[in-house]
Amino acid sequence: MSSAKRVKLSHSKAPGPFRKPSSGDRAAAKVLTKKITQAPKAAAPIKQKAREAEEDDDDDDKDDKDEEDEEQNDDSSDEASENDDSTPTVEEATKEGQTELPSKEETPTKSFRDLGIVEPLCEACEALKFKKPTPIQEQAIPLALQGRDVIGIAETGSGKTAAFALPILQSLLEKPQPLFGLVLAPTRELAAQIGQTFEALGASISLRCAVVVGGLDMVSQSTALGKKPHIVVATPGRLLDHLEKTKGFSLRSLKFLVMDEADRLLDLDFGPILDKILKFLPRERRTFLFSATMSSKVESLQRASLRDPLKVSVSSSQEKTVSTLIQNPLFIPHKHKDVYLIYLANEFAGKTTIVFTRTVNEAQRVSILLRTLSFGAIPLHGQLSQSMRLGALNKFKARSRDILVATDVAARGLDIPEVDLVINFDMPQDSMTYIHRVGRTARAGRSGRAISIITQYDLELWLRIEKAALNGRKLPLFQPDKEEVMVFKERVEEAQRHAREEMKALHEDRGKKGAVLKGRKRGSATKRRHDDMDAEEG
């Protein structure tokens, strides 16, 4: 075993050499699937390589531009209309005052090295099985490395986290300091997963990352912030609490701000809190804004927080879902919903599956139903404590449970890379929720399937979703043989009785404690408590 010393990021001088990740790395770094095998390199050569990579990219861009100019001169007489549609370079867009770069999805895929990422971070990407940049990474990373503010508009599951994490870590390597970057996320689960990504990418350089979210102890969070982490990932409300109440905590020296899922941040009415947070941050900073959509609210946030940004988008088609996603409606009578769900669970046994329900109560019941019939199901919803929500996610990611039964708390932003199937057990109420639900599968270029169970009560809703999310395109039906489905009917009825009894006991137990599970709403006096439902899951 190597006796090499562990070298940490310095705050007063250039960082020391990289080391190979050891088994003692923090828990988040355990997602590394293989060790970085190349010999460590000193920071000075890393900087030199980064500059050389950027110069090489600049030379390549100049050569490409010269070739494009020659082609345009040759064909200008008879292909003027095609020239009008050509993709401008960053330099052209900047010179002409243009702030949006069209999609380059037809451009041959580059490697992370081609984008200007330094070797140690490229090795970390390889260790995490990031084989090649996704379209949003390919477009956003070079702009970020050039020092520009960036707006990224991309389909859900496109790899946005690495698109901002890699440039921030590369800048941190060049000029290390505490409290270097801040990432704001709309949900606790997304914040936790962004933190895990940063720690995994920075495992070889002893990166310190603090995740600050609601539902957890503020004192322990204050202690973590007092240790001056390099990166802070937070939900807006809890971050503002610390900015206003935690002594000695300041972000006045911050270099990078990221607002991830910005449209969701504003949908959840975080706008006033974001305004307050911005007052605590320095004006001289770099800002990245990533969003699935570009609404008027997001545009207002952009004007308030970004300086002369370049906007990149990889959503080239009008259809809102990715091309690698197979979508099927399943039309059935309402009374047979449970039977068809069990048929699907059996048909796709062994596949990682998310089953979406509309209410907390139904998520609990369906989870019990599946477990009674020996399927590895676990619930995820807003009435679980934060630790239990993260526990459910970790079990699902680790494949110790292959079915996650969730309300829309899991529909947006969760980074679960390998979800094979999404089942809409209850139809969502609008097209955007549908898009974000089915976007949990077929992420970052992978294929996936989404099956929506549609009863006689959902037809009008489905037609609206079909028109808004699919531009009216008719999807192929999922049509199982009815006799094969009804084979499960008797066993499902027995499991339904068991689920009703268990739900009744749960309600009675919670009634005694003063916290009753409800389907759509919770009373203002209801407290969030640990959910005893899944205690047997460990």
Swiss-Prot record:
A motif (Q motif) lies at residues 110-138. Gene3D superfamilies: P-loop containing nucleotide triphosphate hydrolases. One of its GO terms (biological process) is rRNA processing. Residues 1-112, 498-538 are annotated as: Disordered. Residues 1-11, 513-528 have a biased composition (Basic residues). ATP-dependent rRNA helicase required for pre-ribosomal RNA processing. Involved in the maturation of the 35S-pre-rRNA and to its cleavage to mature 18S rRNA. Interacts with the SSU processome. This is ATP-dependent rRNA helicase RRP3. It comes from Pyricularia oryzae (strain 70-15 / ATCC MYA-4617 / FGSC 8958).
